[in-house]
């Protein structure tokens, strides 16, 4: 308010002096023309239009009277000082208004700082903010989402992007090494895998953190896919050719499911707690060590028989990842 009052005093005084000294019409226009030419043209017009009192315009003066030079210099100096004071006070007024508005409306920089901080720290910082159950439920929801996609999206699109096979791998669809571990078609398949993921995954996340669990899941998925491809490449190279239309080509046989990833999580928990009691088929109590031996032996048998719809090679890939993770933990390297 003080800045506004001062500006009004300066403007009123300058306007009154202009009227007193500008009785002759020629002098009034002469002074106004001299002031405009010596000060910056754009700024003088701007301030004069918005802050100086308006007066009727007259025809421009084309001649200069030398007798009014001294008087013009004094008036010009007065107006220049008045304009300078007014410009300073105008700046103070703008700053005070900006400060007032800023105090009434606080800065909304939290979201930007939060986003920039997320960019700087990346996924690692984001994962550290998640709880153990958050990661487990997130993996379950991701698997359930792909399960729904099988019933909504085009089947060929799903086979090309959510199933692992030698054809997909040779075609450059390397993302299927991971996406196939989130893919299920049969309801019984996804239910059994998600139950194992929930119970054993919660135990692993509680002991080593959610970031470790996510890395273990992805490593198990990758290990299961690699073992699956190696096994089917071997079968494609050794299988007889031209045995009829009903012989499956191993290079074109696709696979899917989270079994490799879940097997890595489950077997790591078994390796860490071999004397714990687990329940086979949900109601048969057996020592964890015996259950682990039984599961690995059954997968080896599936590979040797070669006619099972369950991929023993993918399960063994998960078991290999679990063994590597267990060895690193034994050496004190908790970061997988």
Curated annotation (Swiss-Prot):
Tell me which InterPro entries the record gives. Answer: Peptidase_S54_rhomboid_dom (IPR022764), Rhomboid-like_sf (IPR035952), Rhomboid_protease_S54 (IPR050925)
Has the keyword Acyltransferase been applied to this entry? no
Q: Name one GO cellular component term.
A: mitochondrion
Q: Name one GO biological process term.
A: proteolysis
Entry keyword set: Hydrolase, Membrane, Mitochondrion, Protease, Transit peptide, Transmembrane, Transmembrane helix
Stated membrane topology is: Multi-pass membrane protein
What name does the UniProt record give this protein?
A: RHOMBOID-like protein 12, mitochondrial
């Amino acid at each position: 308010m003080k800045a506004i009052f001062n500006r009004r005093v300066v403007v009123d005084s300058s306007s009154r002096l202009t009227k007193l000294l500008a009785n002759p019409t020629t002098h009034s226009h002469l002074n106004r023309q001299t002031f405009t030419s010596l000060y910056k043209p754009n700024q003088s017009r701007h301030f004069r239009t918005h802050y100086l009192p308006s007066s009727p315009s007259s025809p421009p003066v084309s001649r200069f009277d030398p007798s009014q030079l001294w008087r013009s210099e004094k008036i010009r100096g007065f107006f220049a000082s008045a304009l300078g004071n007014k410009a300073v006070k105008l700046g103070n007024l703008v700053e005070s208004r900006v400060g007032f508005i800023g105090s009434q409306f606080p800065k909304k920089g939290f979201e930007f700082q939060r986003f920039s901080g997320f960019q700087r720290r990346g996924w690692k910082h984001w994962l550290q903010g998640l709880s153990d159950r958050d990661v487990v439920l997130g993996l379950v929801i991701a698997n359930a989402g792909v399960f729904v996609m099988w019933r909504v999206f085009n089947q060929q699109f799903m086979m090309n992007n959510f199933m692992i096979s030698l054809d997909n791998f040779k075609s450059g669809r390397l993302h299927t090494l991971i996406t196939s571990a989130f893919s299920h078609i049969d309801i019984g398949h996804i239910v059994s895998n998600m139950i194992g993921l929930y119970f054993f995954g919660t135990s692993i996340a509680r002991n080593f953190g959610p970031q470790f669990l996510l890395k273990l899941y992805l490593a198990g998925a990758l290990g299961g896919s690699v073992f699956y491809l190696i096994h089917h490449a071997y079968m494609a190279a050794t299988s007889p050719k031209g045995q009829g239309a009903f012989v499956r080509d191993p290079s074109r046989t696709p696979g899917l499911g989270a079994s490799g990833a879940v097997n890595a999580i489950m077997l790591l928990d078994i390796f860490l707690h071999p004397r714990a009691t687990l329940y086979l088929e949900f109601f048969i109590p057996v020592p964890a060590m015996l259950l682990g031996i039984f599961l690995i032996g059954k997968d080896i048998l599936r590979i040797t028989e070669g006619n099972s719809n369950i991929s023993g090679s993918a399960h063994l890939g998960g078991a290999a990842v679990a063994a590597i993770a267990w060895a690193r933990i034994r050496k004190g390297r908790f970061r997988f």
